[in-house]
Regions:
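Hydrophobic, proline/glycine-rich low-complexity stretches
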Residues: 1-4
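A short, aromatic/hydrophobic, helix- or strand-capping loop or linear motif
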Residues: 6, 10, 57, 103, ...
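Rieske [2Fe-2S] iron-sulfur-binding domain
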Residues: 10-128, 171, 350-353
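C-terminal catalytic domain of Rieske-type non-heme iron oxygenases
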Residues: 38, 112-353
């Protein structure tokens, strides 16, 4: 995972002159935005006495530690120690490359030189973006698998906006092919064809009620992750304004409702019936949460009984398994290529909820 760029935070949620703690992939970092607006990711603790740097103060383009005032520049070099006469060149924090685009802050958290940033052309242009970053209380890999699982719509989401789109009236015919970027999966239910891309190692691209959607599932730790979701809509000025207003209104209703994760957990514990959530504004997340939380903290894959409808899951696991085997053997894993013009061509129509 650390060999790739990953989103780590929503751009709109980080003000200039602000530092805050960040936990991604089981590791703690400091995330900040300088006064000029540049987002940075660096080590979480001061070199002096180990205080969290997220409690410090952003001064121009540098960060001053809250405890004894040690100051660090964008390269991680300590530029000031107020109580000391000198500031050796060797005093350096580790910093991580960042790139900000499509409403998200991306970081490369691996060793060595960062690879080229992947093209995100399908999310860029004259359209409008809507970004969401929900925290999910289960393993990120489980969510990736669920996003490729077409059959679960017929059962998990039988009461949902998908029902209005003919998604549950018949089981899908499935095709899944390996590509230079990961997998291309097509499902067909009568006249409805739905295309979904899986881009290695943890991203899904689809059409979601008329908008292009790309989601990155980034682990916080083994039992939770953030689903960084970018929806992009092109159209007339009025169409874009209406769509954006609708998304914001839905987001406001979700924010005012009980958190989807808590509702899902209560259903799994037997405290609520599934039907009690039918009017929740984030119903799809509640339903997926029930299905995924009910698998347990760590799903038991050794005893799975997979079938032909799980072809997407089998192929995706094989891609991961091959890369991990190469790394274990000291071999260079496959270079995955995200095409600049990769666009999903079929999906849910615009009339969904």
């Amino acid at each position: 995972m650390r060999r790739f760029w990953h989103p780590v935070f929503a751009s709109a949620q980080l003000d200039a002159g602000r530092a805050r703690p960040l936990r991604i992939m089981g590791q703690d970092f400091t995330l900040l935005r300088t006064q000029s607006g540049r987002a940075q990711v660096l080590a979480d603790r001061c070199l002096h006495r180990g205080t969290l740097l997220s409690t410090g103060t952003v001064e121009g383009e540098q960060l001053r530690c809250f405890y004894h005032g040690w100051k660090y520049d964008p390269s991680g070099r300590c530029t000031e120690r107020p109580a000391e006469r000198t500031c050796p060149e060797s005093l350096r924090l580790r910093t991580y490359p960042t790139h900000e685009t499509v409403g998200l802050i991306f970081a490369y958290l691996g060793d060595g030189e960062a690879p080229p940033f992947p093209p995100l052309d399908p999310l860029q242009g004259d359209g409008v973006l809507f970004v969401e970053t929900p925290l999910r209380p289960f393993n990120y890999f489980r969510q990736i698998e669920n996003a490729l699982d077409e059959v679960h719509f017929n059962f998990v989401h039988r009461v949902s906006p998908f029902a209005d789109q003919g998604m549950i009236t018949e089981l899908p015919e499935l095709r899944c092919e390996e590509t230079e970027f990961g997998l291309s999966r097509i499902s067909k239910r009568g006249s409805i064809e739905r295309q979904t891309y899986f881009l290695m190692p943890n991203s899904n691209a689809s059409l979601f009620f008329g908008a292009r959607r790309q989601v990155w599932r980034v682990p916080i730790d083994d039992t939770s992750h953030i689903s960084f979701t970018v929806d992009y809509l092109e159209g007339t000025t009025d169409e874009k304004a209406e769509w954006l207003a609708g998304r914001r209104e839905t987001a406001a209703r979700i924010a005012a409702a009980p958190p989807a994760a808590e509702v899902s957990a209560a259903i799994v514990r037997g405290e609520l019936p599934v039907e009690s959530a039918k009017d929740h504004p984030d119903l799809l997340s509640v339903q997926d949460g029930v299905a995924l939380l009910a698998q347990g903290v760590c799903a038991d894959r050794e005893n799975e009984a997979l079938g032909l409808s799980d072809i997407h899951l089998v192929k995706m696991r094989r891609l991961w398994s091959q890369d991990l085997s190469d790394l274990d053997a000291g071999r260079e894993p496959r270079k995955w290529l995200w095409p600049a013009k990769l666009k999903v061509t079929s999906g849910l129509p615009e009339t969904g909820g």
